[in-house]
From Swiss-Prot:
GO terms for molecular function: flavin adenine dinucleotide binding; mRNA dihydrouridine synthase activity; tRNA dihydrouridine synthase activity; tRNA-dihydrouridine47 synthase activity; zinc ion binding. The lineage of its organism: Eukaryota, Fungi, Dikarya, Ascomycota, Taphrinomycotina. GO terms for biological process: mRNA processing. CDD domains: DUS_like_FMN. A zinc finger (C3H1-type) spans 42-70. It catalyses: 5,6-dihydrouridine(47) in tRNA + NAD(+) = uridine(47) in tRNA + NADH + H(+); 5,6-dihydrouridine(47) in tRNA + NADP(+) = uridine(47) in tRNA + NADPH + H(+); a 5,6-dihydrouridine in mRNA + NAD(+) = a uridine in mRNA + NADH + H(+); a 5,6-dihydrouridine in mRNA + NADP(+) = a uridine in mRNA + NADPH + H(+). This is tRNA-dihydrouridine(47) synthase [NAD(P)(+)]. It comes from Schizosaccharomyces pombe (strain 972 / ATCC 24843). Disruption phenotype: Decreased ability to complete gametogenesis.
Amino acid sequence: MAELETGAVPIREEFLVKQDGNKKRKRKERGQNKRREKIHVKENNALCPAISIGNECPYKENCKFPHDVEAYLATKAPDIGDKCPIFERYGVCPAGFKCRWLAGHVVINADGKYELIKKPDGQFTLFTVNTVGKEVQRKLRTKQLDLSKAESIISAVLGEEKPDPSSKVSNIPEENRDATSAISEGKETESVSLEETGVLKNQTVSVNVDLKEISSQARSNIALPTLRPQEKNLIDWRDRKILAPLTTVGNPPFRRLCGSLGADTFYSEMAMCYPLMQGHQPEWALVRGLNYEREMMRGGRRGILGVQLATGKLWQATKTAQVIAEQCDGVDFLDLNCGCPIDLVFRQGAGSSLLENPGRLLRNLQGMDAVSGQIPVTVKLRMGNKDDHPVVKNLIGRIFNETNTSAATLHGRSRQQRYSKNANWDYIGEIASKVKSMNERIDELPEDSLRTQPLSLIGNGDCYSWQDWYDGVNKGVDTVMIARGALVKPWIFEEIEARQFIDKSSTQRLEMLEQYCNNGLEYWGSDSQGVNTTRRFFLEFMSFFHRYTPIALYEVQRPRLNDRPPLYTARDEMETLLASNKVTDWVKLSEFFLGPTPERFTFTPKHKSNSVEEAEG
């Protein structure tokens, strides 16, 4: 076996490419291309949306878009192909005359005019869920939406309302009731800002708390209207095949691809609560999903879809949870992100910043759970912010005692560590053991406890094979969440089901890319704008997908996510192209399915690597 540097994939010697030992290694780049240029290519000649699908325009002569179909088609970009993938599947194409595969569903009628074709049983059955309308977004911007339910719960969480004598916490000592929401881990005092209500600013009430005098009963209860056990939907998290929330690349077309390969639990991309409450349309687009994600999956379980939120403020978490619970039609659970390490999120007091403020973290969970109706709430955690200071061992007990959280996901890394070292699954195992012990004593909790269900623990970090998944489950967690591993190898869910490695050929991997593009065209549209959007996200996906090294080339079949292969010779020409780390080759692959790139098209991947170069088409 050839000698390999630490972190290198053990490639069989006959596939290795000999290198000049005197060649200077290029410095590895990390992080994100934060200042990358984004160019949105749009059609120069628009067509009325109603006319484009063969309908009459309700605005008629007052419409701001042209209605001349022949003039539009005369200047329209050439068709990419003569078979529309959407029409072939559904018998109808929602893009109409704007479709870049128009030849597949248009004819010239007896009057010499273009006419769209629709099969007798043609129906576009892919529906988008969790679409919040423009009117709701307008009311959010103008603060006209009724959020009184959230406001009353916020007041209760902050202890601003006197508890009803008949409430579940009436037997808590008076001095402990006001202190309950002000407990902070490792501190004797904490200031509770009224700014968290979203109403008052620059006013602070300080609450002196002696931790030694606060009873355990007071710590596990707050004066707010909790739901009865039967009013919360219960989720069995055991052995679920969970696809992690993935910023930029975790879009509905990618989630649909993973669903076809065995995933059954999905998250939206992380959405920030503040722009959601401002009615910011691009942020609300992150919440959307597909009806497909909640249908029966190949493993025999119904798929579930969650919405992940990030915020550091109680009023944002609670009010956003109310809006989503009341306005969205496809949410199975809400997730509070307390693990995001990104500076932009951390500096706002959100993400992993909440690990340093457990009192605020718990209040956010309490508010979300109380306002979300039947929708359960989950939380995403990291070990801590610093390598030498893990905090979850203490925090998980408070989450169990002081909230009704359905599940907690633990990423076995610190914020400081990012992805530079392997995830600490021994620590995850310790937390799993503690959660199991607490669940065994759930019947011993007082009747006025908020907890009405066991707490599930989901492990996360470095899952790249079926062996990693089962090793994680053997640590005691209910299931393992898969993130980057699914981007590099989307069929990892098939491997878990089969309990063996599956070596996909270059032809099979190319078919996956075609499926991804077709998913994108169905979701974003098969017009020019939809094609360009699909191409952009396809290239982001390729920045991970190209990293796969065929398992047949391994000398030792135990792939690790952070390992990088040395230069090797692939088994065929297409496999070589799929393994290329050049953006120009990724663009070439996109042209197989989406046609030539526009003249002004440029692309810089969000995630840096040695291979990244700007590509122009």
